């Protein structure tokens, strides 16, 4: 779970 990747989505 990456919160940074979540911001990218």
From Swiss-Prot:
Source taxon at top rank: Eukaryota
A single cellular component GO annotation: extracellular region
Localization, UniProt: Secreted
Alphabetic keyword roster: Neuropeptide, Secreted
BP terms from Gene Ontology: neuropeptide signaling pathway
Coiled coil ranges: none
Main location: secreted
UniProt keyword Secreted, yes or no: yes
Family in the record: Belongs to the FARP (FMRF amide related peptide) family.
Biological role: FMRFamides and FMRFamide-like peptides are neuropeptides.
Protein name from the UniProt record: Extended FMRFamide-2
